[in-house]
Amino acid sequence: MSDIFEEAASFRSYQSKLGRDGRASAATATLTTKIRIFVPATNSPELRWELTLFALDVIRSPSAAESMKVGAAFTLISMYSERPGALIRSLLNDPDIEAVIIDVGSMVNGIPVMERRGDKAQEEMEGLMRILKTARDSSKGKTPFVDSRAYGLRITDMSTLVSAVITIEAQIWILIAKAVTAPDTAEESETRRWAKYVQQKRVNPFFALTQQWLTEMRNLLSQSLSVRKFMVEILIEVKKGGSAKGRAVEIISDIGNYVEETGMAGFFATIRFGLETRYPALALNEFQSDLNTIKSLMLLYREIGPRAPYMVLLEESIQTKFAPGGYPLLWSFAMGVATTIDRSMGALNINRGYLEPMYFRLGQKSARHHAGGIDQNMANRLGLSSDQVAELAAAVQETSAGRQESNVQAREAKFAAGGVLIGGSDQDIDEGEEPIEQSGRQSVTFKREMSISSLANSVPSSSVSTSGGTRLTNSLLNLRSRLAAKAAKEAASSNATDDPAISNRTQGESEKKNNQDLKPAQNDLDFVRADV
């Protein structure tokens, strides 16, 4: 039987890589689009700045074709290079486009001067002039910059040009991090990163671009795979460089840290919180299939090479194999662990159709019960004695209890999945609290089949105190006191039957109070079940 299990694991690995070997035998070439890319022929600061302004206007012009805007994006992205044309020729390898690189030696009225002469060149220059005119007319006289003085600035020294180009390119590179995964909600994170570079004095806020222009550029990045491919090639290239790098290359490399692995948070969170925590729950038979899948995906990720972190940006078809829907049980368990021990994971949207509530709660419970667990291999490397290990485990348990009491709802990601409330079950709920709603669906608290009173009375105080600590004891005592108060109210209401009006009113108030008391009782029941 061991052979079939080994073959199953090997088959998973083969299935993940199926069809990736060999070369295509059929003619799979696609139609191409011709784009014109204007690059400076010299290092003149004045020429480069005028060409930069021209590219900014083309991208915001409503009359410019998409191919024209793509060419302008290539111009802006490569402007930091000493030889932009050589950079584009060496890195551009896109079967969807045919790049025509045009060296610009001079500018007239803000447009490049064509080297060749004749009616054709004159018509092209007139077309470029119309593109600039519509860009300025559509913006009602506004410039691409927040400070309009930057648009009319005449740059003649190289230091000012470098500062301006780095600032403009930094804003473009910041856009790519969310251009594919969340373009509609990207402004907040982009603003934080821009503020970071301003605070570090790595960019000049005088050359800050308007939000309208950034929106146009973000949309272009979302639509154009060719531009993203070129940017990814630059990211891969700048990582290969040695210790001596220019300012522009350093800031591009820094932004690349945010771009890496974009769109693959579920895969890497599963590895981090599902595997590397090494909780005993991984021994469950239900997880073995997902574990084999994750193992084969990790091997495949390594085989893809340096482009693997950017597979979502590059729209590679292999990216779908890394989606959490391929290993839903292990992912659900990992998300339960993550939302319990990592505060930053509380904001991650894990409300997916393939989320398994039972394994999500199992992850939460494992993270709580195994807080303070010690890795014996690491303890042996550090030379820790048994007393030191015990003290460390006790300290972690103590701090973990305080952390959970402080903000359980935020830490454990209380949210609605499929109309059922998950997580956050071990904190007391105010009697006046309303049921939580999310995405237009009312959350439903799980029904309890076990009697509350029987469960509360069946757990000795001593066992509860030792297993769950003081917090569990107090919660159980509160539960018992509420049950006793409820019984006293029922006895009092049964004696007030002489006056029918009073009896009816008392009965209605009692039912309303009982319903309110039931919510915290159910919540405390979750707490008892989670810790006993």
From Swiss-Prot:
Which BP terms from GO are recorded?
negative stranded viral RNA replication; negative stranded viral RNA transcription
User: Which region ranges are annotated with the description Ncore?
Assistant: 1-402
Query: So what does mutating G432E actually do?
Result: In strain: Isolate NiV/KHM/CSUR381
Indicate the principal place this protein occupies in or around the cell. Answer: virion
Classification via InterPro entries:
Paramyx_ncap
Domain topic, free-text comment? Ncore is globular and carries the regions required for self-assembly and RNA-binding. Ntail is an intrinsically disordered monomeric domain in the C-terminus.
Q: Describe the function of this protein.
A: Forms the helical nucleocapsid (NC) in a ratio of 1 N per 6 ribonucleotides, protecting the genome from nucleases. The nucleocapsid (NC) has a helical structure with either 13.4 N per turn, approximately 20 nm in diameter, with a hollow central cavity of 56 nm in diameter. The encapsidated genomic RNA serves as template for transcription and replication; encapsidation by N is coupled to RNA synthesis. Forms the encapsidation complex with the phosphoprotein protein P. Before encapsidation, the newly synthesized free N protein, so-called N0, is chaperoned by P.
> How is the subunit organization of this protein annotated in UniProt?
Homomultimer; forms the nucleocapsid. Binds to the viral genomic RNA. N0 interacts with the phosphoprotein (via N-terminus); this interaction allows P to chaperon N0 to avoid N polymerization before encapsidation. Interacts (via C-terminus) as N-RNA template with the phosphoprotein (via C-terminus); this interaction positions the polymerase on the template.
Mind telling me what this protein is named? Nucleoprotein
User: Whose protein is this, by species?
Assistant: Nipah virus
The taxonomy runs: Viruses, Riboviria, Orthornavirae, Negarnaviricota, Haploviricotina
